[in-house]
Amino acid sequence: VHTLYPLYSWFFYELGIKTFLSTEVAHEGVARAEAQYCFPAEIAHGAIQDCLDKGADYVLMPHFRDMPSYEDKVHANFCPITQALPYYMEKAFPDIEAKRWLPLVVSFKFGEGKALELFCEMTSLLGIGEAETRTAFNKAWAKQKAYFEAVEKMGIQALADARKEKRPVIAVLGRPYNAFTPEANMGIPRKFTTRGYSIIPFDILPFRDEVIFPNMYWYYGQQDLKAANLLKNEDNIYLTFITNFSCAPDSFILHYIKWMMGQKPFLVLELDSHSADAGVDTRVEAFLDIIDGYRTKKNEIDAERYDNGYRFVSERVGDSDEFNMYINNVKTKEKIPVKDNKRVKILLSNMGNISTQYIGAVIRSLGYNAQAMPVATNKTIQIARANTSGKECVPSQLVLGSALEFFFSDEYRKDELYLLFVPITTGPCRTGQYYVYYENLFRDLRLENVVIFILSADNSYTELGPSFAKQMWIGVALSDYLKDIQCSLLATAEDPVQAEKVFEHSWRHVMNAVEHKPKGLWKELKIAASEIKKIPLKRSVNSCPRVLIVGEIYVRRDDFAVNELIELMSARGIVVKVAGVGEWIHYLDFVREYALKKLVRLQKPGKRLFSKPSRDLKKLQIEEWWKHHIEKKILSILNPTGLIPETPHDMRHIMKYTVEHFVNLELNSEIAVSSGSAAAAMDAGYSGIVNISPFACLIGRVIEGLFTPWARERNYPILSVEIDGNLLPPNIVNKLNIFMVNVLRFKGGQDVSTLVDKAGE
């Protein structure tokens, strides 16, 4: 609302609709929050309550999806908590008629014309025609652009004035909703001005052409980093960054600002609903003292950051689907091939032992030297935390910790080159920031022979060409089903320990075939299925209650993160199904198809059929058919074991649940697919849902805020668990025991007496 207020206010004014802003944070509204959101989201609950208390006929809660990007190769979206605001607010205020919420998706990714369509969808609910909406939108957007131009002129003047000031000038960074509003910023700008220091808000500065770290896909992240880069060499301007406890984007953005600023001091103020005014005063005064000390030494030259000179390069070969991969040494100009080169080793972080070992075997079979990292341990997380701020999410710490554990071990050799594989995304989650963070952290650690090796989720990780992509998909689908079997055996086998040994022996043989005899995979898989089928069972999968684990993809698939939950539930006879990696890939394909269909509609009618988006769409649909074919082939071999729980997998079916009950399709994240798959599973006979996520994960908390009230209305058992890399604390174990009792009762005919006894052990 702060960034686009000219657009909103003029738009409704032109339509003859009176508008007003909230002025209070009503505590009754804050208390309605269904999850532990960040401070600004808590305030939003109270602000909406204030609007309702003041008699608003309608409340505008935009799904603020994206803005025009400052960067050429990456879009500019917003964090999941910001984007999902209208969806979890509707769940938090179930007593408010749905028609009082004005659903508006704000998206400029595909231009103003597409943005107008979304405004028309909203006004149609108010009985306002398209022509009137178009006129109002065009006038309002012109006012918005005029506002942007005016404030940039103010920024240019403010920058010029700051250079002439005798006293230091403070630039306030953050986000408009937490840095510039009195409800959220605890009067921090005033604390500087009352001491005689001038303030410049970050979003008026002329930073458009500033160079920042790659893949910065958050709109306000782009603005903050560009502002920081603009000001790092300004002798008289110093940064104060206002952030909030558990702010996921800032857990990485603050690292980037630290690397940008070098030795120049800047202040970070982390606020929440418990922050004390006196503590903020103390930090402001200390910062001003530090500035005075720094200014006396500002002519000292910062040391140049270390750079090992190695860059990973992946180049498409002509118009084909093949890629040429090599490591470029920018210092010596040497191009070091990755394929068929024992000197280069690809390191695969463990995200589920079966899938990681499979991908490692596939990569080796293609002529690359690859090593799958072992399952993480407590030591892994400790090593990571010794080299981080601790605010990063657990998956980033596990990937980093496994790499550093290897680099600090006897296996590490200086005569080798290591490619650390890090998959990336383009938001809105933090995953896409991992590789940027690792690259710069490794520079700080002065690692001489380590390079980051990236693939992108936007292409369903197919950059290495069709051969690898096909083998990877077989591995993903197979690993998902093998994980199902492994979990089912824990709950149903007469001797789970012996069953695990038989199972591991079987899948290891499959992995050996993948690496050394790829054509023998299906034969070896049939042998494995036959051996697994012989394992004695004390109960069938169908007779057991089933629980689906959804949530953030890394922790739900990482054995170190999720196994304690699985083992505790399996010991009570509950079959656990962990939502697969394949589900995520199908969702990525669904999102690609959805985006391509939008692009096709933007083409001129006579050219749509043969346009590039149309051709890409047909190609994608063929890929999807093939992926489903592989899944059916694997299932036909493994299903006779009787150990694969039946689960809804059709993505279109899942997304129907998502749209009907949770979020708009424009919200592209794990939120959409996990909420929909959980709801579909419960309606398909599951007895409970566990939503697992890293501590303070944006995705996990929004899923909790959406799914918990939906499940509560239907008396469905639901448990949300946040993983911090340690054993589950007693309070979570107690909640898990209560959840398991509810699961057994929901299934019906289950004896819960043993569970009650064990809960007291």
Question: Model-derived features: where do they sit?
Answer:
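An N-terminal assembly and electron-transfer interface module characteristic of large anaerobic redox
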Residues: V1-E761
